[in-house]
Amino acid sequence: MDEYVIDARGIRKSFPAGDAAPEEALRGIDMTAPAGQLTALIGPDGAGKTTFLRILCGLMKPTAGTVSVLGTDVTKTPQQVQERLSYMPQKFGLYEDLTVRENMDLYADLHGIPREARPARYEKLLHMTGLSPFTERLAGKLSGGMKQKLGLACTLVRTPDLLILDEPTVGVDPLSRKELWEILLAMKQEEHLSVLVTTPYMDEAALCDRVYLLNHGRFLFRGTPEQLRETAQGFCYGTKPPENVPTRMVQSRLLTDPAVIDAVPSGGMVRFITRVPDGALPGLSELRLSPQPMESRLEDGFMMLLKEDAEKEKGDVPLYGTDKVDISSFDDPSSHDTVITVRHLVKKFGDFTAVDDTNFTVHRGEIFGLLGPNGAGKTTTFKMLCGLLPATGGELSVAGVDLRTARTQARAHIGYVAQKFSLYSAMTVFENLRFFGGIYGLSGKRLRERIAEVMEEFDLTEKQHEPAGTLPGGFKQRLSMAAALIHQPKILFLDEPTSGIDPIARRRFWQQITALAAAGTTIIITTHFMEEAEYCDRMMIQDQGRLLILGRPSDIRKEMGRPDADMNEIFISIVEKGRSSPSSGA
């Protein structure tokens, strides 16, 4: 058993569910994690990943099964195990009113690290995380990426025998994700650190030695990243849409075909998975598109197993609906009216300039992406566009209304979905919709009609009497969308709408967004999933308050000299180039 830092056998965990049968979160799973390796635990939202991590850390007892961590039965002597492992939960407990160094001191005190051992350890961690220049900065003043790095540094103030991380990069931009993983890989190499990490990012799982795929409390896969990738080999294809047709339109059409396991925009193409020989789908020939074989990726194996499991449970029912998008009727939004105009926009907080002389326009029916690293100024820009924050200078109009003088009037034309889905947990789905409809001025027959319409549109009718707080993540997202659209706004603002949502729910979400845009709704979106930049008609990338680049994804790739690269690579290149230029002040 000593060769494994984790040896779990037959783990079950059930939670009471009132008068109903107990809810089974884990259904008899086995896991072994060898010492000195990086092990990834992946799976959709609600799969049971966090429950399993808490059991391994001795924070929760299993209903059944045995758990040996670092050679010790964690169910009998949890404290003995906890003295040798470090755990970084999703919401790590930084003290925002303490400085970077004070947070590290606090965790060093908690772990009993001798004072004479701290300087060398601190120096190494601060250097690796890039936090050396910020030791006296309050944690609350750090960007999201820097907070995650500080959380990791605090977790590693002692040298643990096992490091357990629960989605350490959710809500973190691609550049910060890359830096965090460089730290993990370096620590594994230098200190022979054993790591178990959960992640929604398949490119991160690909960096690990072993991968476990959990769904509905059961493991669908155990093995190496390469073995998971190979499960989809020979079933992956790509097709390139005509110049004037967005990849999202072709993707949405493909997803309605029961023979398509998955489809996603990537590098200006649409990648898809199908068991149909040579990828020769009738829908492609109708669109005069040709498939070409492609190498599988780890995400392809992930989606293939997840889709097959879902269809076993739900039967032969298309997961993405059957409503076909009419690609022939696509109307390029660049020819439509301008609904958002931004000229020389500036926002200052005291002496700090969060947004500096930014200019852009957005057209009716356009999907426009606001992208950037944590702390880039995109959230500030987003809030000014929504009328939630006044600008310091410049011109800003939304739906023909000047936001400098009539913010309340402009908000009547806007729908807004916040990062954390601003729902009332104790109220039912129906009650939430009635409440938000009332806020937007709907009443009587019109309110009842709109509630019925959005419940049908977002498949919420069967859930209408359930409290919002008990809904799975994907349903909460749908309810937030329904609430934001109940008054039929001209413009929909989406702030990190797919964070923490499983891949199948993400695909459904983008089908709905594609349909909304085709019907004339303008979409403004922020996201850290760079694949989602491919859905945008145009996008802008900000950093340090400055606009670095603006244009169509395909044009931006060409401008960077990499027409076939994925947007993750392009994003990192643009930000690194911007920070190295003399005008960046870096």
Label every model-predicted segment:
Residues C57, C386:
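Helix-to-loop junction immediately C-terminal to a conserved catalytic motif
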Residues G65-D73, Q80-V81, G394-D402, Q409-A410:
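Conserved ABC transporter NBD signature motif
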Residues D105, D109, E116-F134, R434, ...:
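Conserved ABC ATPase "signature" region
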Residues L138-L142, P467-L471:
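Conserved ABC ATPase signature
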Residues L163-D166, L492-D495:
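Catalytic Walker B motif of ABC-type/P-loop ATPase nucleotide-binding domains
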